[in-house]
Amino acid sequence: MSDRDNLAALAYGPTRRQLIAGVAIAFGGLALGSPEARAEAEDGISRTAESIHQEALIKASRKRVYDALTDTKQFDKVIQLSGVMKSMPPRGTPSEISREVGGAFTLFGGYITGRHVELVPNQRIVQAWRTGGWDPGVYSIVKFELVEQGSGTKIAFDQAGFPKGAAEDLAAGWKAHYWEPLQKLLT
């Protein structure tokens, strides 16, 4: 299977092995994760089996939504509207986002970090994504699928490969810190 096939598989329902392969591609072939995480891949047992699916309707074009998610200045406005930085210790700039496949991003003052696995302008964003509270080397895969719906954009969002027990907090965070501020910013 080529690297391109691995990336395509990641975007459409990844298995644990595909997640690890895709993240390794995104990070230039580095071995990621703890020894336990690497053992999971070898023994085929997933300890990060949970996933999240959410949909949000944003009253804006796909281009405006894509730009808000991939442009540093736009995403800084999302962060400001979320209010989350008020409750966090100062950690530097709100966000820094590369707009290239393989490029890094740092969000919410460094609390969220990762790399872009796939960028299809105005259609799809796939990222290797992590919070600062996770064990070193643990990344989830997030996918934002942007679908035109009437005069707005439906974001079909999926996240897989995160630590067990994190689903509830992550799901609430996506709503409070992404979908609601995006709606405020773009309408």
Where are these regions (language model features)?
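Short amphipathic alpha-helical signal-transduction/dimerization elements
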Residues: 178-187
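Hydrophobic pocket/interface hotspot
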Residues: 65-66, 75, 105, 116, ...
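A solvent-exposed, acidic/Ser-Thr-rich amphipathic alpha-helical stretch
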Residues: 85-101, 107
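Hydrophobic-ligand binding "helix-grip"
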Residues: 106-150, 160
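N-terminal secretory signal peptides
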Residues: 1-14
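Intrinsic-disorder/low-complexity, polar/charged segments enriched in Ser/Thr/Lys/Arg/Asp/Glu/Gln
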Residues: 49-55, 62, 104, 111, ...
